[in-house]
Swiss-Prot record:
<keyword id="KW-0689">Ribosomal protein</keyword>
<dbReference type="InterPro" id="IPR020040">
    <property type="entry name" value="Ribosomal_uL6_a/b-dom"/>
</dbReference>
<dbReference type="InterPro" id="IPR019906">
    <property type="entry name" value="Ribosomal_uL6_bac-type"/>
</dbReference>
<dbReference type="InterPro" id="IPR036789">
    <property type="entry name" value="Ribosomal_uL6-like_a/b-dom_sf"/>
</dbReference>
<comment type="subunit">
    <text>Part of the 50S ribosomal subunit.</text>
</comment>
<dbReference type="GO" id="GO:0019843">
    <property type="term" value="F:rRNA binding"/>
</dbReference>
<comment type="similarity">
    <text>Belongs to the universal ribosomal protein uL6 family.</text>
</comment>
<dbReference type="GO" id="GO:0002181">
    <property type="term" value="P:cytoplasmic translation"/>
</dbReference>
<dbReference type="GO" id="GO:0022625">
    <property type="term" value="C:cytosolic large ribosomal subunit"/>
</dbReference>
<keyword id="KW-0687">Ribonucleoprotein</keyword>
<comment type="function">
    <text>This protein binds to the 23S rRNA, and is important in its secondary structure. It is located near the subunit interface in the base of the L7/L12 stalk, and near the tRNA binding site of the peptidyltransferase center.</text>
</comment>
<keyword id="KW-0694">RNA-binding</keyword>
<dbReference type="InterPro" id="IPR000702">
    <property type="entry name" value="Ribosomal_uL6-like"/>
</dbReference>
<protein>
    <recommendedName>
        <fullName>Large ribosomal subunit protein uL6</fullName>
    </recommendedName>
</protein>
<dbReference type="InterPro" id="IPR002358">
    <property type="entry name" value="Ribosomal_uL6_CS"/>
</dbReference>
<keyword id="KW-0699">rRNA-binding</keyword>
<dbReference type="GO" id="GO:0003735">
    <property type="term" value="F:structural constituent of ribosome"/>
</dbReference>
Length: 179
């Protein structure tokens, strides 16, 4: 049984939650998110809280209950505060800039990379080496940051590439040389 799924989700002021069949819509100051809910799970609003209920108790239903609770809690958090991921670029000549809704990256390749940001995602570049990805959908923010990182993953010898700000690169020693 999911312990996470049993906890109610608090609805902050300024956020409205509407349930229609197997679809939940959360509206808040930063925007609106909609998601389909897994069959066998139902949501109930009780005052300023959302309760996640299972139609029948079982191992799979308990797992889905915890999943749905976490997803809806992330939706509520997203429309109130939003989410952000910070990426850092390390390397000589590596830089980034935002042009409209696209991110231009120079990462040591023979060509610049132009990445069109998904709808609902904004990016900000500080000092050409720090990228801040923001949005209200946690899943989309994480996927966008992972896609940007995948253009040049950090390598273990010099640490060049795109990495998350909180990520620690385990460095390797170079060749030992002749003996």
């Amino acid at each position: 049984m999911s312990r996470i799924g049993k906890k109610p989700i608090d609805i902050p002021k300024g956020v409205t939650v509407s349930l229609a069949g197997d679809t939940v819509t959360v509206k808040g100051p930063k925007g609106e998110l909609t998601r389909n809910i897994v069959a066998g799970i139902r949501l109930e609003t009780a005052g300023d809280q959302i309760l996640v209920q299972c139609e029948k108790e079982g191992k799979q239903e308990g797992a889905y209950r915890g999943l749905v609770r976490a997803l809806v809690a992330n939706m509520v958090e997203g429309v109130t505060n939003g989410f952000e991921r910070v990426l850092e670029i390390n390397g000589v000549g590596y830089r980034a800039e935002v042009k409209g809704s696209a991110l231009n990256l120079s990462l040591g390749y023979s060509h610049p990379i132009e990445y069109a940001l998904p709808k609902g995602i904004s990016a900000e570049v500080e000092k050409q080496t720090k990228i801040i990805v923001r949005g209200i959908d946690k899943e989309l923010v994480g996927a966008t940051a992972a896609k940007i990182r995948s253009f040049r993953k950090p390598e273990p010898y010099k640490g060049k590439g795109v990495k998350y700000a909180e990520e620690r690169i385990v460095r390797k020693a170079g060749k030992a040389g002749k003996k």
